[in-house]
């Protein structure tokens, strides 16, 4: 899911860039991980021909992910839809808005349980979700457990509260919420798509982008009613944008996005206009509410979702593997691989302090 055709547009205009890690030695870069998006992507890419059971393949896939994160000096904060165990109910966001719109139209399909997010590739093994989550918990990694939010919204919250520097996912609707994305961490220089580069390419500010490209959101529109990014971009061509304006608009990362988000509603056609479906307006209202800091006296505060980090415990890692793999020898082998290649992660608060405070001070010298 995401913005229909954005990756194609981004590659055509060379907006997907290889990024060198620029933090000082010993400083980890905090990033949000859209867990199931990333795991399914790795499963499809590397485990099509596996003959091992699903639990073993899940463990090996997670091990691959954690090793890549460690090599790139990333500190992951794991995020998933409907809480870390996936047993909540989404009450806000694009999927909830679309479900409510479908129910209002009298389509009973909205009352059906959500379809599992699954690979279209025939031989891709299934992920054992409970095993994956328990390994993350017992290895001592940080995660977010908010049962009524989509992963995309949690990632956007972490990004705009200056908790994470980027979001690792292939869901391009993160750009619509003003976030920078890591598309692939496997290359030595990870592939990154930045919101400000997309805006500069289109010659729009964030409010204009949100108002115009919401019609490309595949969670809000069903084919063939969804527009592609290229279609909308072509409709914007011919507008003159002074070079100095572009420079001013995209000089910073977050403040302009927070400031401009609320203007998007004023750019939409009037409520009730057929050119502005209700779902689009409600989604933009949701994004504005999500990105706008609340006023507390003379302060503006954007609250961060709570982060959980449990102590690492090798016995619980082995127990989780044994429970799902059901082969003691293989469970011991896998537990040994995790403990050999993945050092226990540091406290997330220390990581954030080192990156956002100490690292910024280092850059100013």
UniProtKB/Swiss-Prot annotation:
Keywords: Decay of host mRNAs by virus, Endonuclease, Eukaryotic host gene expression shutoff by virus, Host gene expression shutoff by virus, Host mRNA suppression by virus, Host-virus interaction, Hydrolase, Nuclease, RNA-binding, Virion
Name of the featured protein: Virion host shutoff protein
Record keyword S-adenosyl-L-methionine present: no
InterPro entries: PIN-like_dom_sf
Keyword presence, Thylakoid: no
Biological processes per GO annotation: symbiont-mediated degradation of host mRNA; symbiont-mediated suppression of host gene expression
Residues passing through the membrane, by range: none
GO molecular function: endonuclease activity; RNA binding
Its EC number(s): 3.1.27.-
Function description: Minor structural protein that acts as an endoribonuclease during lytic infection. Degrades host mRNAs in the cytoplasm by cutting them at preferred sites, including some in regions of translation initiation.
Highest taxon of the lineage: Viruses
Chief localisation class: virion
Cystines in this chain: none
Stated family: Belongs to the herpesviridae VHS protein family.
Cell compartment(s), UniProt: Virion
Enzyme's top EC category: hydrolase
GO CC, any one term: virion component
